[in-house]
Amino acid sequence: MIEVGIVGGTGYTGVELLRLLARHPEARLRVITSRGNAGTRVDELFPSLRGEVELAFSEPDVDRLAACDLVFFATPNGTAMQMVPDLLARDTRVVDLGADFRLKDVETWSRWYGMTHACPELVAEAAYGLPELNREAIRGARLVANPGCYPTAVGLGWLPLLEAGLVETRGLVASCVSGASGAGRAANVATLLCEVNESFKAYGADGHRHLPEIRQSLAQVAGGAVELTFVPHLVPMTRGMHASLYATLRGDAGDLQVLFEQRYADEPFVDVLPAGAHPETRTVRGTNLCRLAVRRAPESDQVIVLSVIDNLTKGAAGQAVQNMNLMFGLPETAGLDAPAVLP
C-alpha cells in the first residue's frame, strides 16, 4: 500500500485528489495539509467525503510528509519548490500539480511566473507528466511535473499530427474554453455566479501562463520550435474543457481518422471518436479521459482537432494519480476507471 500525503488539500484540485485517492485500491492517505484549516476534519469542510476520508487537515510538516512514499502538491505556484528538495533528499517521491517544474528553461519560468526559482537544479530532473508522451520517463522519476489543463487538452490533440510531421509548425491555433473551476476556489469577483452566468469571454489573449508550457510540449514532439496562437475562454459551467485546434496540412496527409485511432489504440485514457462525431465536455465529467475528434476543413488544407477533458481530472488530479500509478508500477488505470457522471 502506497502511503500518500497531499499538501494543499482545500482547493478544487486538492479535493478532487481526495475523492480519487479515497477509493484507490493501492493508496492510503496519511497526511493532508492546509495552513488555513489545520485541525478541521476533512469531512467537515467537504461533507461529500463523509465516510471516505477520516483525516483532519494539519500544518505542513516536512518530517510527517517525508514519512510518506509520495507527496502531491496541489498548491499555488512557488510553494512546492520550497519543500521538494527536502522531501527528495529523504527518498519521498513528488508529483507537483503546480507549475514549479514544468518549464525546462528557468529564465522563461521566472519571467512568466514573476519569481526566482528556489531549486533550479531540480528542474532538468523533473519528468513532464503527460503519460501519452513521456510514459517511460515518468516510470523512473522521483519528481513529476503534472501538466496544466490547457497543455493537456492541446497536447493530446496535436500529438499524432506533429509526431507524423503532417502539419506546418507555424500558424498553429488553439481556441480553448474552460469551466469556472479552472480559476480555483478562492473568492474572486470575476468567477461569481452573477458575473459568469449567461456570459462568455476570452482572457489572457495577450499571454497566458500555459502558453510557454504548450510551446515546450509541442516542440518536443515536433523536433523544433512551433509558432502558436493560444486564446483561452471562460464559460459558465463548473468543470470541463474544450479545445478547438487548427493547423495547415503538409501535402497529402492520408486518412487522419486512422492516424489518430492507431496512435491512441493502446492508450487507456484517450478515446478517439468515430468519424463525424463531436466530443462533449459532459461525456468526460469526473473522468480521466480525453475524447478527441479529427476532421479536414472542407475544400481546404486545414485540419481541425476537437479535444475535451475534465480540467480537474485529466487536467489535474486524475492525471496526477495516473502518474503515481506509473511511478509505483501499478496498473495505470488503478483508481481511475469510473465512467462520466451524467447528467
UniProtKB/Swiss-Prot annotation:
InterPro entries: AGPR_type-1, NAD(P)-bd_dom_sf, NAGSA_dehydrogenase, Semialdehyde_DH_NAD-bd. GO terms for cellular component: cytoplasm. SMART domains: Semialdhyde_dh. One of its GO terms (molecular function) is NADP+ binding. It catalyses: N-acetyl-L-glutamate 5-semialdehyde + phosphate + NADP(+) = N-acetyl-L-glutamyl 5-phosphate + NADPH + H(+). Gene3D superfamilies: Dihydrodipicolinate Reductase, domain 2, NAD(P)-binding Rossmann-like Domain. The keyword ATP-binding does not apply. Its EC number is 1.2.1.38. It comes from the Bacteria. Pathway: Amino-acid biosynthesis; L-arginine biosynthesis; N(2)-acetyl-L-ornithine from L-glutamate: step 3/4. One of its GO terms (biological process) is L-arginine biosynthetic process. The active site is at C149. It is found in: Cytoplasm. Keywords: Amino-acid biosynthesis, Arginine biosynthesis, Cytoplasm, NADP, Oxidoreductase. Belongs to the NAGSA dehydrogenase family. Type 1 subfamily. Catalyzes the NADPH-dependent reduction of N-acetyl-5-glutamyl phosphate to yield N-acetyl-L-glutamate 5-semialdehyde. This is N-acetyl-gamma-glutamyl-phosphate reductase.
